[in-house]
Regions:
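Aromatic-lined carbohydrate-recognition surfaces of secreted/lumenal glycan-active proteins
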Residues: 28-75, 91-97, 118-131, 162-165
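Substrate-binding surface in catalytic domains of secreted glycosidases
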Residues: 11-22, 93-110
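Short, small-residue-biased leader/transition segments that mark boundaries at the very start
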Residues: 1-8
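Short, flexible/disordered intra-domain loops and linkers
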Residues: 19-23, 55-76, 133-142, 172-176
């Protein structure tokens, strides 16, 4: 509670998946149902990643991988996943950092189309750190964050969340660049 107001309005199912992994649909369905049962039916959301070319282990020295998911395969697999979970998961905020900037529109459009098909909300999870640098990870340049947010808007998304504000965008972060990223964000959206 904050004062007399409930501050939790939904439940986040924190398990992360990207593709149709064996048992994923059943696991997310069970977790979504449990969240709904214990919360009295509050909305639930997930934030999966897209198995794009930037989906490499943070501990590796690589920035990209040779094999990545096509838009068509992503659509087919997530159609099956959404079909199995849409009655217990209300929203999906795909992480945007594993695909390249020239792929944002294609993947975002597919995500929105599938979410609409299954009556789910589609948000973006705009990563506020940069996967394009050999040192992992620094706060992202605002121009790159803006590109991702604008692609989400073009696809019809009406909500955005970010990972990871406290490290990569907060004025209180140990990274000096994080405070500057926050300032650019506020300027762009005319937030006083």
């Amino acid at each position: 509670l904050v004062g007399s107001e409930m501050c939790i309005r939904d439940r986040y199912i924190s398990g992360e998946i990207s593709r149709q992994t064996r048992g994923a649909i059943d696991a997310f369905r069970a977790m979504g149902k449990q969240c709904k049962d214990v919360s009295g039916g509050l909305p639930t959301f997930i934030s999966p990643w897209i198995d794009g070319k930037k989906a490499v282990q943070a501990s590796s020295g690589r920035l990209t991988k040779a094999e990545s998911i096509s838009v068509e395969t992503h659509e087919r697999e997530w159609n099956e996943i959404f079909d199995g979970i849409h009655d217990v998961v209300d929203a999906c905020a795909f992480q945007d950092g594993h695909i390249d900037y020239d792929e944002l529109d294609a993947f975002f459009s597919v995500n929105k189309k599938l979410a609409d098909k299954y009556g789910m909300q589609c948000w973006t999870n705009a990563e506020s750190f940069d996967r394009d640098m050999p040192i992992k990870f620094f706060p992202i340049k605002f121009d790159k964050l803006r590109l991702k947010l604008e692609a989400a808007k073009r696809a019809g998304y009406d909500k955005a969340i970010t990972f990871e504000f406290s490290h990569f965008m907060s004025p209180q972060s140990a990274y000096l660049q994080a405070g500057h990223l926050y300032d650019r964000y506020r300027e762009y959206f005319e937030i006083k």
